[in-house]
């Protein structure tokens, strides 16, 4: 699938994550900003990549600003931002 527009999901509140996505032509680029990047950075990035793979997204610029979100919150925000960016009309229940 293709990213059609810039999109954003989440907040900068404690225990949340804000994910922004934009169209790209050079594969998937993830910029992670987090106070716990050293401990959990690989897991956060893996969760985002898992959602992108489920939607068959091959090109995207993604910025993730983590404020201590749990993995399930990160996944939910990633799904929301992709759904907005691809202008989905119906939810892809297989991804959930």
UniProtKB/Swiss-Prot annotation:
A Pfam short name: ACP
Modified residues (O-(phosphoribosyl dephospho-coenzyme A)serine): 14
GO terms under cellular component: cytoplasm
Keyword Cytoplasm appears in the UniProt entry: yes
Domain of life the protein comes from: Bacteria
Keyword Cytoplasm: yes
Keywords, alphabetical: Cytoplasm, Phosphoprotein
Protein localization: Cytoplasm
HAMAP family linked: CitD
Protein role: Covalent carrier of the coenzyme of citrate lyase.
Subunit structure: Oligomer with a subunit composition of (alpha,beta,gamma)6.
Annotated family: Belongs to the CitD family.
Name of this chain's protein: Citrate lyase acyl carrier protein
Organism, as annotated: Lactococcus lactis subsp. lactis (strain IL1403) (Streptococcus lactis)
